[in-house]
Amino acid sequence: MKIYIQPLSVNSHTVEVLANSLPKIFNAEVFVLPASDVSLKCYNASRRQYNSTCILRMLPPIKVTLGVTGKDIYAKGMNFVFGEAELGGARAVLSVFRLTTADSELYRERVVKEAVHEIGHVLGLKHCSNNCVMRFSNSVQDVDRKPVSFCRECASKIRY
């Protein structure tokens, strides 16, 4: 499997964390695409956030492409999201905006968990109620409580 990371207005340290972590988790080759900025077409000035669906649609439709941004993002009907993905599709987007903390190890864990979660959606997984990386996170505390790994049930359903 190949994973393409598309940096979108995000620091290089975050990209490096993912480029070093994802190959081990998914037994995948990881390629970092040239960095670019999030399109202003996706910006909602009244919310001061970027629309995650708009960003998702601007990513190359190559399975698996993970857009990673430092911008705050939202989806329709939500105050914010950590990410959005095409279920069983090719693309996902992850925002690290609300994952930031002074604790560098905790930041790394959060970023990796949410990247694995979004890639899990691309690989066909829905949200899970088990103690699993696919558990829905409504807050950063929810992210901190879940593991970085898939439960057995989810691991058996992954469609590479």
UniProtKB/Swiss-Prot annotation:
Top-level taxon of origin: Archaea
Protein family (similarity comment): Belongs to the peptidase M54 family.
Record: residues binding Zn(2+) 2: C128, C132, C151, C154
Protein role: Probable zinc metalloprotease whose natural substrate is unknown.
Protein's recorded name: Archaemetzincin
GO biological process: proteolysis
EC number(s) per entry: 3.4.-.-
Subunit structure comment from the entry: Monomer.
Record GO terms (molecular function): metallopeptidase activity; zinc ion binding
Cofactor binding annotation: Binds 2 Zn(2+) ions per subunit. One is catalytic, whereas the other seems to have a structural role.
Pfam family, one: Peptidase_M54
PANTHER family reported for this sequence: ARCHAEMETZINCIN, ARCHAEMETZINCIN-2
Higher taxonomy: Archaea, Methanobacteriati, Methanobacteriota, Archaeoglobi, Archaeoglobales
Active site (record annotation): E118 (proton acceptor)
Cofactor: Zn(2+)
Top EC class, one word: hydrolase
Sequence positions that bind Zn(2+) 1: H117, H121, H127
Alphabetically ordered keywords of this record: Hydrolase, Metal-binding, Metalloprotease, Protease, Zinc
Protein's organism: Archaeoglobus fulgidus (strain ATCC 49558 / DSM 4304 / JCM 9628 / NBRC 100126 / VC-16)
NCBIfam families in the cross-refs: archmetzin
